[in-house]
């Protein structure tokens, strides 16, 4: 069976979702949102903070900043 490739956006969102990394999301209108991604699809991101969920449409997102360092890819050792 062929391996399905995953785009960078899905890889990033799935990593922060699985690791429950807190994010700051800036919208194109300047609004700043913070929370943890609980789910996402092709069109939106479900963000949770203080027991409340917000559905954010991806077309409204400008920037996403993780609250801590994260590793999405396996480390590759540099040959000496």
UniProtKB/Swiss-Prot annotation:
InterPro entries: Hfq, LSM_dom_sf, Sm
A GO molecular-function annotation: RNA binding
Domain Sm: 10-70
Key words, A-Z: RNA-binding, Stress response
Cross-referenced SUPFAM superfamilies: Sm-like ribonucleoproteins (SSF50182)
An example Gene Ontology biological process: regulation of RNA stability
Classification via Pfam families: Hfq
GO CC terms: cytosol
HAMAP family: Hfq (MF_00436)
Subunit structure: Homohexamer.
Similarity comment: family membership: Belongs to the Hfq family.
Function of the molecule: RNA chaperone that binds small regulatory RNA (sRNAs) and mRNAs to facilitate mRNA translational regulation in response to envelope stress, environmental stress and changes in metabolite concentrations. Also binds with high specificity to tRNAs.
Full protein name: RNA-binding protein Hfq
Lineage: Bacteria, Pseudomonadati, Pseudomonadota, Alphaproteobacteria, Hyphomicrobiales
């Amino acid at each position: 069976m062929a391996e399905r490739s995953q785009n960078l956006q899905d890889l990033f969102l799935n990593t922060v979702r699985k690791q429950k990394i807190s994010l700051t999301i800036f919208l194109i209108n300047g609004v700043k949102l913070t929370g943890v991604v609980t789910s996402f699809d092709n069109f939106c991101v479900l963000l949770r903070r203080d027991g409340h969920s917000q559905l954010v449409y991806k077309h409204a997102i400008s920037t996403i900043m993780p609250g801590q360092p994260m590793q999405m890819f396996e480390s590759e050792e540099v040959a000496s």
